């Protein structure tokens, strides 16, 4: 078997990085002095790394992050904000995902909620978890349209399948009974096998009324499923008169999420 035949077969098996590495070794005279086992290990490492990198790129692309450049390392803990750095660094390990626990990120507009959520999502991608970002207004519209058209189960899978779901603008507006039913279906199916990050301008104690309060029989069911064992990250202002939008701090377009 010729070397070119080996290269062609590697390419046919979609092992292009391994094929390139093998070709480079054949052209490098110094490689002849290295034992076969070591050379083969080097080639396998190159293919392995290439596949891992490709998988990571796909996960990040499929997540559809609002802020794809967000990182935990770049999270700003200053600028007149009170934020739990120790908890954030702990959650960056993604242990909460293995525990199937949720995260609540609350704070005013421009406080950096979306950035932090996307940073958590990026850490999850780096550990090869599937992630999905979505604005709740878009989510509710998508689910209700799907229900009206008889394709609700298929639409729901987009949001139940990811290991980590980022729900931005959570309860920005009061939801309808139909919205509540769709949310309950989503939250129930994700419970005990995945994690969700909720980003909201409102404190958790206000969510009950935003969901309809006592007038909505589904309110208790929703809150019970998302609140238990959830991690809370309130982003608070130390002095409202000195507030600065985190969009400016992170160099983001003013039209981007909170």
Residue ranges and their predicted role:
Residues 80-89, 131-160:
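Short glycine-rich substrate-engagement loop in P-loop NTPases that contacts/grips substrate
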Residues 11, 16-67:
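Interdomain "pre-motor" coupling segment immediately N-terminal to P-loop NTPase/helicase cores
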Residues 101, 128-130, 161-164, 191-198:
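Loop/turn-to-beta-strand initiation segments
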Residues 92-100:
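Phosphate-binding P-loop
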Residues 121-134:
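Post-Walker A helix-loop "phosphate-sensing" segment adjacent to the P-loop in P-loop NTPases
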Residues 100-116:
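Walker A/P-loop nucleotide-binding motif
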């Amino acid at each position: 078997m010729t070397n070119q035949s080996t290269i062609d077969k590697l390419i046919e098996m979609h092992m292009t990085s391994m094929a390139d590495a093998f070709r480079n070794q054949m052209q490098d005279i110094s490689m002849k002095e290295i034992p076969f086992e070591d050379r083969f290990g080097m080639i396998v490492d190159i293919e392995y790394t290439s596949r891992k990198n490709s998988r990571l790129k796909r996960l990040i692309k499929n997540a559809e992050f609002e802020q794809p450049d967000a990182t935990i390392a770049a999270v700003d803990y200053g600028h007149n904000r009170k934020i739990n750095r120790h908890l954030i660094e702990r959650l960056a390990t993604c242990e909460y995902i293995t525990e199937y626990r949720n995260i609540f990120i609350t704070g005013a507009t421009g406080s950096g909620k979306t950035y932090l959520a996307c940073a958590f999502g990026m850490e999850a991608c780096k550990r090869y978890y599937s992630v999905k970002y979505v604005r709740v207004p878009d989510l509710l519209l998508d689910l209700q349209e799907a229900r009206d058209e008889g394709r609700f189960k298929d639409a729901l899978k987009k949001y139940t399948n990811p290991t980590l779901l980022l729900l931005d603008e959570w309860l920005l507006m009061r939801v309808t009974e139909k919205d509540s039913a769709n949310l309950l279906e989503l939250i129930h199916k994700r419970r005990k096998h995945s994690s969700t990050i909720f980003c909201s301008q409102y404190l958790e104690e206000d969510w009950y009324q935003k969901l309809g309060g006592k007038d909505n029989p589904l309110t208790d069911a929703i809150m019970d499923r998302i609140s238990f064992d959830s991690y809370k990250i309130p982003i608070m202002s130390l002095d409202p008169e000195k507030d600065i939008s985190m969009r400016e701090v992170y160099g983001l377009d003013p039209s981007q999420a909170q």
